[in-house]
Amino acid sequence: MNWITNYVRPKINSMLGRREMPENLWIKDPESGEMVFHKDLEENQWVVPASGYHIKISAKDRLKHFFDNGAYETLENPKAGVDPLKFRDERRYIDRLRDAKAKTNLDDAVVNAIGRIEGLEILATVQDFAFMGGSLGMAAGEAIVRGFETAVERRLPLVLFAASGGARMQEGILSLMQLPRTTVAVDRLKEAGLPYIVVLTNPTTGGVTASYAMLGDVHIAEPGALIGFAGPRVIEQTIREKLPEGFQRAEYLKEHGMVDMVVSRLEMKATIARLLKILLKEQATEENGSRRLPAPEAAVVEAAVNA
Protein backbone atom coordinates (compact mmCIF):
# COMPACT_ATOMS: atom_id res chain seq x y z
CA MET A 1 0.00 0.00 0.00
CA ASN A 2 1.30 3.50 -0.77
CA TRP A 3 0.18 7.12 -0.46
CA ILE A 4 -1.64 6.96 -3.82
CA THR A 5 -3.80 4.10 -2.61
CA ASN A 6 -4.31 5.48 0.86
CA TYR A 7 -4.86 9.15 0.08
CA VAL A 8 -5.23 10.09 -3.59
CA ARG A 9 -7.73 7.41 -4.66
CA PRO A 10 -10.20 8.08 -1.79
CA LYS A 11 -10.02 11.80 -2.58
CA ILE A 12 -10.82 11.20 -6.25
CA ASN A 13 -13.66 8.83 -5.35
CA SER A 14 -15.18 11.36 -2.95
CA MET A 15 -15.03 14.10 -5.59
CA LEU A 16 -16.42 12.05 -8.47
CA GLY A 17 -18.63 9.65 -6.55
CA ARG A 18 -22.40 9.90 -6.44
CA ARG A 19 -23.61 12.23 -3.71
CA GLU A 20 -26.69 11.51 -1.65
CA MET A 21 -29.35 14.23 -1.78
CA PRO A 22 -31.66 14.95 1.14
CA GLU A 23 -35.03 13.25 0.69
CA ASN A 24 -37.03 16.39 1.49
CA LEU A 25 -35.19 18.73 -0.88
CA TRP A 26 -38.07 18.58 -3.40
CA ILE A 27 -41.72 18.22 -2.47
CA LYS A 28 -44.45 16.92 -4.78
CA ASP A 29 -47.60 18.98 -5.23
CA PRO A 30 -50.47 16.54 -4.45
CA GLU A 31 -52.73 18.28 -7.00
CA SER A 32 -50.56 18.76 -10.09
CA GLY A 33 -47.69 16.38 -9.37
CA GLU A 34 -45.24 19.25 -9.84
CA MET A 35 -41.98 19.04 -7.89
CA VAL A 36 -41.36 22.20 -5.86
CA PHE A 37 -38.11 23.20 -4.14
CA HIS A 38 -38.70 23.18 -0.39
CA LYS A 39 -37.08 26.60 0.14
CA ASP A 40 -39.57 28.14 -2.30
CA LEU A 41 -42.41 26.55 -0.34
CA GLU A 42 -41.09 27.81 2.99
CA GLU A 43 -40.86 31.36 1.66
CA ASN A 44 -44.39 31.07 0.22
CA GLN A 45 -45.92 29.83 3.51
CA TRP A 46 -46.14 26.28 2.14
CA VAL A 47 -48.52 27.30 -0.63
CA VAL A 48 -47.56 25.82 -4.01
CA PRO A 49 -46.91 28.86 -6.27
CA ALA A 50 -48.34 27.39 -9.48
CA SER A 51 -51.47 25.57 -8.25
CA GLY A 52 -52.17 27.42 -5.00
CA TYR A 53 -52.43 24.10 -3.14
CA HIS A 54 -52.10 24.60 0.63
CA ILE A 55 -49.67 22.10 2.17
CA LYS A 56 -49.95 21.51 5.91
CA ILE A 57 -47.80 23.99 7.84
CA SER A 58 -46.27 23.65 11.29
CA ALA A 59 -47.46 25.83 14.16
CA LYS A 60 -44.09 27.57 14.39
CA ASP A 61 -43.95 28.36 10.65
CA ARG A 62 -47.52 29.67 10.73
CA LEU A 63 -46.78 31.99 13.66
CA LYS A 64 -43.57 33.21 12.05
CA HIS A 65 -45.43 34.32 8.92
CA PHE A 66 -48.53 35.54 10.76
CA PHE A 67 -47.04 38.00 13.25
CA ASP A 68 -45.34 41.30 12.36
CA ASN A 69 -41.63 40.68 11.70
CA GLY A 70 -42.11 37.10 12.90
CA ALA A 71 -41.93 38.34 16.51
CA TYR A 72 -44.11 36.75 19.18
CA GLU A 73 -44.10 35.48 22.76
CA THR A 74 -45.23 31.91 23.41
CA LEU A 75 -47.19 31.04 26.53
CA GLU A 76 -46.12 28.12 28.66
CA ASN A 77 -48.69 25.35 28.47
CA PRO A 78 -50.09 24.08 31.78
CA LYS A 79 -49.09 20.60 32.89
CA ALA A 80 -51.59 17.79 32.38
CA GLY A 81 -51.71 14.11 33.24
CA VAL A 82 -49.75 11.83 30.92
CA ASP A 83 -51.29 8.53 29.79
CA PRO A 84 -53.95 8.39 32.55
CA LEU A 85 -55.48 5.21 31.11
CA LYS A 86 -52.15 3.42 30.49
CA PHE A 87 -53.45 2.98 26.95
CA ARG A 88 -51.92 0.59 24.47
CA ASP A 89 -52.94 -0.43 20.96
CA GLU A 90 -50.23 -1.50 18.52
CA ARG A 91 -47.88 0.68 20.58
CA ARG A 92 -47.95 2.24 24.02
CA TYR A 93 -49.54 5.70 24.07
CA ILE A 94 -46.61 7.07 26.06
CA ASP A 95 -44.27 5.96 23.25
CA ARG A 96 -46.43 7.70 20.65
CA LEU A 97 -46.29 10.89 22.74
CA ARG A 98 -42.53 10.69 23.02
CA ASP A 99 -42.15 10.28 19.24
CA ALA A 100 -44.54 13.17 18.53
CA LYS A 101 -42.61 15.46 20.87
CA ALA A 102 -39.31 14.53 19.22
CA LYS A 103 -40.76 15.01 15.72
CA THR A 104 -42.34 18.44 16.34
CA ASN A 105 -40.30 19.79 19.26
CA LEU A 106 -43.61 20.64 20.95
CA ASP A 107 -45.09 19.61 24.30
CA ASP A 108 -48.44 18.85 22.65
CA ALA A 109 -50.60 19.79 19.67
CA VAL A 110 -51.44 23.38 20.75
CA VAL A 111 -49.27 26.52 20.82
CA ASN A 112 -50.42 29.86 22.28
CA ALA A 113 -48.58 33.02 21.26
CA ILE A 114 -48.99 36.77 21.72
CA GLY A 115 -47.80 39.20 19.07
CA ARG A 116 -48.94 41.93 16.70
CA ILE A 117 -50.51 41.88 13.25
CA GLU A 118 -50.39 45.26 11.51
CA GLY A 119 -49.65 46.76 14.92
CA LEU A 120 -52.67 45.21 16.66
CA GLU A 121 -51.81 43.01 19.65
CA ILE A 122 -53.61 39.67 19.64
CA LEU A 123 -53.38 36.16 21.04
CA ALA A 124 -53.13 33.31 18.52
CA THR A 125 -53.87 29.69 19.37
CA VAL A 126 -52.52 27.23 16.79
CA GLN A 127 -53.03 23.48 16.48
CA ASP A 128 -50.21 21.51 14.86
CA PHE A 129 -51.50 18.55 12.86
CA ALA A 130 -48.05 16.95 12.90
CA PHE A 131 -48.49 16.23 16.62
CA MET A 132 -50.68 13.11 16.60
CA GLY A 133 -53.03 14.60 14.03
CA GLY A 134 -53.68 17.68 16.15
CA SER A 135 -55.88 15.51 18.34
CA LEU A 136 -57.54 17.02 21.38
CA GLY A 137 -56.43 15.48 24.66
CA MET A 138 -56.09 16.77 28.20
CA ALA A 139 -52.87 18.69 27.54
CA ALA A 140 -54.23 20.29 24.35
CA GLY A 141 -57.49 21.14 26.11
CA GLU A 142 -55.64 22.75 29.01
CA ALA A 143 -53.56 24.79 26.55
CA ILE A 144 -56.65 26.02 24.69
CA VAL A 145 -58.37 27.01 27.94
CA ARG A 146 -55.18 28.78 29.07
CA GLY A 147 -55.17 30.73 25.80
CA PHE A 148 -58.74 31.95 26.30
CA GLU A 149 -58.11 32.81 29.95
CA THR A 150 -55.01 34.81 29.04
CA ALA A 151 -56.90 36.66 26.30
CA VAL A 152 -59.56 37.68 28.85
CA GLU A 153 -56.97 38.72 31.45
CA ARG A 154 -55.00 40.84 28.96
CA ARG A 155 -58.03 42.09 27.01
CA LEU A 156 -56.83 40.66 23.71
CA PRO A 157 -58.79 39.39 20.69
CA LEU A 158 -58.15 35.71 20.02
CA VAL A 159 -57.49 34.06 16.65
CA LEU A 160 -57.57 30.26 16.62
CA PHE A 161 -56.13 28.13 13.80
CA ALA A 162 -57.86 24.74 13.95
CA ALA A 163 -56.20 21.63 12.52
CA SER A 164 -57.33 18.37 14.06
CA GLY A 165 -58.65 14.90 13.48
CA GLY A 166 -60.79 15.21 16.62
CA ALA A 167 -60.62 13.87 20.17
CA ARG A 168 -57.57 11.81 21.17
CA MET A 169 -58.86 8.25 21.48
CA GLN A 170 -56.00 7.17 23.75
CA GLU A 171 -57.43 9.35 26.53
CA GLY A 172 -61.04 8.20 26.24
CA ILE A 173 -63.66 10.18 28.17
CA LEU A 174 -60.96 12.49 29.55
CA SER A 175 -60.43 13.69 25.99
CA LEU A 176 -64.17 14.20 25.40
CA MET A 177 -64.34 16.31 28.57
CA GLN A 178 -62.27 18.94 26.77
CA LEU A 179 -65.20 19.74 24.45
CA PRO A 180 -67.42 21.35 27.13
CA ARG A 181 -64.39 22.84 28.89
CA THR A 182 -63.25 24.68 25.77
CA THR A 183 -66.84 25.72 24.99
CA VAL A 184 -67.11 27.37 28.42
CA ALA A 185 -63.79 29.14 27.75
CA VAL A 186 -65.19 30.56 24.49
CA ASP A 187 -68.28 31.83 26.34
CA ARG A 188 -66.11 33.66 28.86
CA LEU A 189 -64.20 35.39 26.06
CA LYS A 190 -67.46 36.53 24.48
CA GLU A 191 -68.85 37.71 27.83
CA ALA A 192 -65.75 39.89 28.09
CA GLY A 193 -66.67 41.51 24.74
CA LEU A 194 -63.55 40.24 22.95
CA PRO A 195 -63.52 39.16 19.29
CA TYR A 196 -62.93 35.50 18.45
CA ILE A 197 -61.93 34.56 14.90
CA VAL A 198 -61.52 30.92 13.84
CA VAL A 199 -59.42 29.81 10.87
CA LEU A 200 -60.40 26.31 9.73
CA THR A 201 -57.45 24.56 8.09
CA ASN A 202 -57.04 21.15 6.49
CA PRO A 203 -58.33 19.07 8.17
CA THR A 204 -60.69 20.22 10.93
CA THR A 205 -62.86 17.27 11.91
CA GLY A 206 -64.37 15.33 14.79
CA GLY A 207 -65.06 16.76 18.22
CA VAL A 208 -63.16 19.95 17.44
CA THR A 209 -65.95 20.95 15.02
CA ALA A 210 -68.49 20.11 17.75
CA SER A 211 -66.94 22.63 20.12
CA TYR A 212 -64.62 25.65 19.96
CA ALA A 213 -63.83 25.51 16.22
CA MET A 214 -67.40 26.43 15.20
CA LEU A 215 -68.13 29.05 17.88
CA GLY A 216 -66.26 32.03 16.45
CA ASP A 217 -67.62 35.46 15.59
CA VAL A 218 -66.14 34.94 12.11
CA HIS A 219 -65.18 31.65 10.46
CA ILE A 220 -62.50 31.66 7.78
CA ALA A 221 -61.41 28.55 5.88
CA GLU A 222 -58.23 27.92 3.94
CA PRO A 223 -58.79 26.81 0.31
CA GLY A 224 -59.52 23.11 -0.07
CA ALA A 225 -59.70 22.45 3.67
CA LEU A 226 -61.67 19.38 4.78
CA ILE A 227 -64.12 20.49 7.47
CA GLY A 228 -66.77 18.33 9.13
CA PHE A 229 -67.66 16.06 12.02
CA ALA A 230 -67.39 12.65 10.36
CA GLY A 231 -65.24 12.13 7.28
CA PRO A 232 -66.80 11.73 3.83
CA ARG A 233 -65.92 8.03 3.57
CA VAL A 234 -67.61 7.29 6.90
CA ILE A 235 -70.73 9.17 5.79
CA GLU A 236 -70.87 7.36 2.43
CA GLN A 237 -70.55 3.97 4.12
CA THR A 238 -73.30 4.92 6.58
CA ILE A 239 -75.90 6.33 4.18
CA ARG A 240 -74.80 4.11 1.25
CA GLU A 241 -74.92 7.03 -1.15
CA LYS A 242 -72.34 8.94 -3.15
CA LEU A 243 -71.69 12.41 -1.74
CA PRO A 244 -71.67 15.55 -3.95
CA GLU A 245 -68.39 16.65 -5.49
CA GLY A 246 -66.31 18.69 -3.05
CA PHE A 247 -68.57 17.79 -0.11
CA GLN A 248 -67.13 19.09 3.21
CA ARG A 249 -64.47 21.12 1.42
CA ALA A 250 -64.06 24.81 2.26
CA GLU A 251 -65.56 26.09 -0.98
CA TYR A 252 -68.63 23.83 -0.70
CA LEU A 253 -69.21 24.94 2.89
CA LYS A 254 -68.88 28.59 1.90
CA GLU A 255 -71.56 28.13 -0.78
CA HIS A 256 -73.86 26.51 1.80
CA GLY A 257 -73.35 29.08 4.54
CA MET A 258 -71.21 27.04 6.94
CA VAL A 259 -68.20 29.38 6.78
CA ASP A 260 -68.04 33.12 6.20
CA MET A 261 -65.14 33.26 3.77
CA VAL A 262 -62.40 31.23 2.09
CA VAL A 263 -59.05 33.02 2.23
CA SER A 264 -55.61 32.07 0.94
CA ARG A 265 -52.93 31.66 3.57
CA LEU A 266 -51.01 34.40 1.77
CA GLU A 267 -53.84 36.87 2.45
CA MET A 268 -54.79 35.59 5.90
CA LYS A 269 -52.88 38.12 7.99
CA ALA A 270 -54.24 41.15 6.12
CA THR A 271 -57.79 39.76 6.16
CA ILE A 272 -57.78 39.04 9.90
CA ALA A 273 -56.24 42.43 10.71
CA ARG A 274 -58.99 44.13 8.68
CA LEU A 275 -61.73 42.12 10.43
CA LEU A 276 -60.34 42.87 13.88
CA LYS A 277 -60.16 46.58 13.12
CA ILE A 278 -63.86 46.45 12.21
CA LEU A 279 -64.76 44.47 15.34
CA LEU A 280 -62.68 46.76 17.55
CA LYS A 281 -63.92 49.88 15.72
CA GLU A 282 -60.51 51.45 15.45
CA GLN A 283 -57.33 51.51 13.38
CA ALA A 284 -54.45 49.62 14.98
CA THR A 285 -51.14 51.42 15.51
CA GLU A 286 -47.83 50.39 17.00
CA GLU A 287 -48.22 52.88 19.86
CA ASN A 288 -51.81 52.02 20.78
CA GLY A 289 -51.68 49.72 23.79
CA SER A 290 -55.16 50.27 25.26
CA ARG A 291 -58.56 50.25 23.58
CA ARG A 292 -62.24 50.32 24.36
CA LEU A 293 -63.82 47.08 23.15
CA PRO A 294 -67.44 46.82 21.97
CA ALA A 295 -69.36 43.56 22.16
CA PRO A 296 -68.57 41.48 19.03
CA GLU A 297 -72.26 41.04 18.18
CA ALA A 298 -72.86 44.81 18.06
CA ALA A 299 -69.72 45.40 16.03
CA VAL A 300 -70.66 42.74 13.47
CA VAL A 301 -74.18 44.16 13.06
CA GLU A 302 -72.84 47.69 12.60
CA ALA A 303 -70.27 46.51 10.09
CA ALA A 304 -72.95 44.64 8.11
CA VAL A 305 -75.28 47.65 8.09
CA ASN A 306 -72.56 50.07 7.02
CA ALA A 307 -70.98 47.75 4.44
Curated annotation (Swiss-Prot):
Component of the acetyl coenzyme A carboxylase (ACC) complex. Biotin carboxylase (BC) catalyzes the carboxylation of biotin on its carrier protein (BCCP) and then the CO(2) group is transferred by the transcarboxylase to acetyl-CoA to form malonyl-CoA. Pathway: Lipid metabolism; malonyl-CoA biosynthesis; malonyl-CoA from acetyl-CoA: step 1/1. This is Acetyl-coenzyme A carboxylase carboxyl transferase subunit beta. Pfam families: Carboxyl_trans. It is found in: Cytoplasm. It catalyses: N(6)-carboxybiotinyl-L-lysyl-[protein] + acetyl-CoA = N(6)-biotinyl-L-lysyl-[protein] + malonyl-CoA. The lineage of its organism: Bacteria, Pseudomonadati, Pseudomonadota, Alphaproteobacteria, Hyphomicrobiales. Keywords: ATP-binding, Cytoplasm, Fatty acid biosynthesis, Fatty acid metabolism, Lipid biosynthesis, Lipid metabolism, Nucleotide-binding, Transferase. Residues 25-294 form the CoA carboxyltransferase N-terminal domain. GO terms for biological process: fatty acid biosynthetic process; malonyl-CoA biosynthetic process. GO terms for molecular function: acetyl-CoA carboxylase activity; ATP binding; carboxyl- or carbamoyltransferase activity. Its EC number is 2.1.3.15. It is an enzyme of class 2 (transferase). Disulfide bonds: none annotated. HAMAP family: AcetylCoA_CT_beta.
